[in-house]
Amino acid sequence: MRLNIFYILLIALCGLYGCKNHQQPIIKENLNILPTIYPEYQGALLPVNIAPLNFKIQDEGDEWMIQIQGKGNPITITAHDAVEIPIKRWRQLLHQNQGGSLSITVSSRKKGEWYQYSPFTLDVSTDSIDSHLAYRLIEPTYANWNSMAICQRELSSFKETEIISNKKSGQNCINCHTFNQGNPNEMVMHMRKINAGTILIQGGACQKLNTKTPHTISNFVYPDWHPSGKQIAFSTNLTQMSFYDAHPKIIEVYDTQSDIVLYDISKNEVYTSPLLANANKLENFPFFSPDGKQLYFCTCDRIDSLPQQFSNIKYRICSIGFDPQNNQFSKQVDTLIDLTNAGKSVTLPSISPDGQFIACSAAPHGCFSSWIPESDLYLYNTKTKKLIAATEWNSPEAESCTTWSSNSRWVIFSSRREDGIYNRLYIAHIDSVGNLSKPFLLPQRDPTYNQRNLKAYNLPRLIKGKVTISPITIGRCAEAKGKKSVRFSKHSYKPLINEATENHSEIN
């Protein structure tokens, strides 16, 4: 009996501390070069709670041995194809090495002989990242789609679940999902074309809104929640597309009209200002300061001769004061970020929760920089008033949408850097003085998944927990015949609308 207990304890300890019969190979030669791996994770800085960085070795070899070392018990893995790191032991190793680094050594067996590559490092931050990430998965097309879904991913694992699929909402278009300060229980999104309406989710309840009024250009489009959760700012847009017949670029997307409005949730009323709904301007992409006292937005002069002169459309980022108690805006607009003299248009802004940095996308023209290869990310420091290019994050292809972690230390952004077609998601660190880390591709259980996946990632949004309302509940809400119509407040400025129609484009 004592002998049996001894063996049971031995087996348990081996499972706990990773005892495996990995016989250390006799190395014939040290190659003194780094292994070629995909994704290219070497030198990345990791959140302490990120999923394993599984990778594929692209060099020639019959068998691989990988050793991951740091404080605590090392991980040794043998592989013939993709390298899959045990998730429990990975989490333990990250926890033990936060603020330090891991060393990864790869050895290759070729024709019975072993060769060892130079080790590469992964740095482990003490900063964690929010637990979940929401995004839309859609074919990288311009106007048509077969299926799309808004999904959520647990970032400490590979678990992906559906928030809503258009299979449950009438095969329609679903877009512009946004959360209140990363709260998974407060969410807004739009249904387009079939079962059209805005879906508002609060505390497990779901309601459908008709947001077209006689004083709005269109239904609500790009949203941002006020930090109080009582109001949501929206743009209203008429968006068009033009295609090239002989040009390296494929498409140009632009607004012919756009305004910004404020929706008061409890009052079911809409407000705006002549400074946010100017017929001679295009206003777009509203977002609030963390204290809720400023509304930032993108704006440029309206041009009638489109698409002929879309190269002259260059947006700036401005701000206007906001009184949340009375839903009133100030009488002055201030310009924060202006790159028009440098020949650039600045759009797709987001602000860190601590209010220190504004991330934005700069391109030669327009407001839909996701399809402009020259589009790069910039960072504006609200304390120093300095704007810098996020050189460490940029690539020759388009970088566009950004989302911030709740501790303001991590940014996830979309990039087409791998093939110029599919938007994929990259994670990068920023410290309190603006130092940037190398971005790394969102980890997948199968490291080749992104090379095989035929869906693009659209509009990443970090959230502090899992969205728990069921896809069936959202789908039923979307397909409901009745919807509550919003109304313009009698106390608000009411713009005159010459043309009002729904958008006909779907851009990702």
Question: Could you describe each region identified by the protein language model?
Answer:
Residues 1-26, 508:
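Bacterial Sec-dependent N-terminal signal peptides
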Residues 19-508:
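Sequence signature of WD/YWTD-type beta-propeller architectures
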